[in-house]
UniProtKB/Swiss-Prot annotation:
Regions crossing the membrane: 55-75, 98-118, 126-146, 150-170, 201-221, 229-249, 272-292, 321-341, 349-369, 375-395, 416-436, 450-470
GO function terms (MF aspect): carboxylic acid transmembrane transporter activity; glycerophosphodiester transmembrane transporter activity
Effect of disrupting the coding gene: Triple deletion of GIT2, GIT3 and GIT4 impairs the uptake of glycerophosphocholine (GroPCho) and reduces virulence in a mouse model of blood stream infection.
Highest taxon of the lineage: Eukaryota
Glycosylated residue positions: N266, N314, N396
This protein's name: Glycerophosphocholine permease GIT4
InterPro entries the record matches: MFS_dom (IPR020846), MFS_sugar_transport-like (IPR005828), MFS_trans_sf (IPR036259)
Swiss-Prot/TrEMBL keywords: Cell membrane, Glycoprotein, Membrane, Transmembrane, Transmembrane helix, Transport, Virulence
Length: 532
């Protein structure tokens, strides 16, 4: 089982992915075909329509990521304002780097710790705790103050930014995981799109709003009152999670978590080694894809600066923030349309198409940088298409792969690890790319082109990993993986009667109490109780 995801021959490596991709494609299949191919849970009824009872919990859980996108992106507004307000006192201090870096650390801590909480305590409890933390620490960042010195204020903001990072990270292995499990209760052929809309599209929408709200506040308060602008920009981020908190109170855990959780398994008997052997390879591949995506995003963002510099060389704060709204809007078409395609072509092929196209366009933009600088309108259009493909492919589907390639028993930890490694990739990018730019400082063009070449090449490598090494991810991937995981644990001597909440009976537990006897004469199947 430790090698189940590895290619078993040269032919399997070269051509095995073709049949796997075909099995994920739903384009052209009728509703009856999708129902026939779908693997259902033991007591699950066939869903043929998207119903609010299943759609609403998926939305309520995933929509919390809007706040994550809003608050996380809103920190850039804070930094912009602090540069204007405090000048060299801020830019030449450690505070500028600390506020950004400490957020990464907090996010990783939140992703890993709440991944464990989500699996071993309760999905809903973890999500509500993350929600409360997000409300509280967002508010603390908005009102941050300590003593009467500027350095005291910087230190206070840094501390609260760390805890806000934990809250943001906590939403990933709780909200996203719950959204994937409720999306799994939707009709086959519709599951991937709703997960993508309620997770990645929510984050992207948060980016858009977080760039537009400061612009509106700037119109109201003018650049003379930037303290009010940045504090209100962050503070308004409290409202969405506050509303969601009361909606989430009425939610319940998903069916798959109730049946598959390992809360009743004693810690000393927890099958850690079996889990590692079963999932090590696919978790490594999914995490590496996420790492590359987040790592590359930093260098891709440098082209924003180039375009703004060419369009408005001496732009005002209004103009700079206005263009920020435009750049963030580029994400939305990719996130929306990619969600549809993810259902029709499957997440692996969709991700590979998106990240592959992004790599090719990125190489072309780098090679033609001098020409593009002279045609700013064309540069903006090409960069917009480039950004759209980023959300169309990896933006939508990295989280989807992380949530559907493992069993419900360990989904929070699995997702949390993959997301944390992705976030580490973003952090590494903030250090690697400036070093590359510094190395090529003698040439303005090379200092911009080389990081883009590196990131674009990694995008193509990511497409290769997705096609050849990620396991099949069909519409019924969650149910299939739950069954395979149960069988694997049972074969290795784990008492699977401990799976699930107390009182929740699975088909496997029923089979322990019911014997199945075949009558050889008429080939009929009779069921009788054991020990009778």
């Amino acid at each position: 089982m430790a090698t189940r995801d590895l290619p078993h021959s040269v032919g399997d490596f070269c051509f095995g992915w073709v049949d796997q991709i075909r099995s994920e494609i739903t384009l052209g299949k009728s509703q009856d075909q999708l129902i026939k191919e779908d693997v259902l849970e033991d007591d699950e009824t066939v869903e043929t329509k998207v119903e609010i009872k299943n759609l609403w919990p998926a939305f309520a859980s995933g929509a919390g990521l809007f706040s994550d996108g809003y608050v996380n992106a809103g920190i850039s507004t804070v930094l912009s304002c602090l540069k204007k307000i405090y000048g060299d006192e801020f830019t030449k201090s450690n505070a500028m780097n600390n506020i950004g870096s400490i957020g990464f650390v907090g996010t990783v801590v939140g992703q890993l710790s709440f991944g464990y909480i989500s699996d071993n305590f309760d999905r809903k409890t973890g999500m509500l705790t993350a929600n409360v933390m997000l409300i509280f620490f967002t508010l603390m960042c908005a009102v941050a103050s300590w003593g009467t010195t500027v350095q005291g204020f910087f230190a206070c903001l840094t501390v609260w930014r760390f805890f806000l990072g934990i809250a943001i990270g906590a939403e990933y292995p709780t909200s996203s995981v719950i959204a994937s499990e409720f999306a799994n209760q939707l009709p086959s052929g519709h599951r991937n799109r709703y997960f993508s809309w309620f997770t990645n599209a929510m984050i992207d929408f948060g980016f858009v709003v977080s760039s537009f709200v400061p612009l509106v506040l700037l119109w109201i308060f003018t650049p003379r009152h930037l303290r009010a602008v940045w504090r209100l920009s962050i503070g308004l981020g409290v409202i969405p999670p506050l509303i969601l908190f009361f909606i989430r109170l009425k939610m319940d855990n998903s069916k798959s978590f109730k049946k598959m959780n390992m809360k009743r398994v004693n810690y000393s008997k927890y099958p850690w080694w079996l889990i590692i052997k079963f999932y090590w390879f696919r978790l490594t591949v999914v995490s590496l894809i996420w790492f590359i995506y987040d790592f590359s995003v930093y260098s891709f963002g440098t082209f924003n600066t180039i375009i703004i510099g060419e369009v408005i060389p001496n732009g005002t704060l209004y103009e700079n923030w206005g263009w920020s709204v435009v750049f963030n809007l580029f994400y939305m078409p990719g996130a929306f349309l990619g969600a549809f395609i993810g259902d029709y072509l499957g997440p692996r092929l969709t991700l590979a198409i998106g990240v592959g196209a992004q790599g090719i366009i990125g190489i072309a933009m780098s090679a033609c940088l001098k020409s593009l600088k002279k045609h700013v309108a064309g540069f903006v259009v090409v960069f917009g298409i480039f950004s759209t493909f980023g959300e169309f492919g990896p933006g939508n589907n990295t989280g989807l792969l992380a949530s559907k390639t493992c069993a419900s028993s360990i989904r929070g930890q699995y997702y949390g690890i993959a997301a944390a490694i992705g976030k580490i990739g973003a952090f590494v990018g903030t250090w690697v790319f400036p070093a590359i730019q510094k190395h090529y400082a003698y040439s303005e063009d090379l200092s911009l082109q080389v990081p883009f070449y590196v990131s674009s090449a990694l995008c193509l490598f990511s497409a290769f990993l997705t096609i050849f090494f990620v396991p099949p991810v069909g519409q019924d991937a969650i149910n299939k993986e739950d069954r395979l995981f149960k069988e694997y644990l049972e074969e290795n001597g784990v008492d699977i009667r401990l799976l699930g909440d107390s009182g929740v009976v699975t088909q496997y537990q029923e089979d322990e109490d019911i014997g199945v006897i075949s009558d050889e004469k008429d080939d009929t199947v009779k069921v009788q109780q054991k020990n009778v």
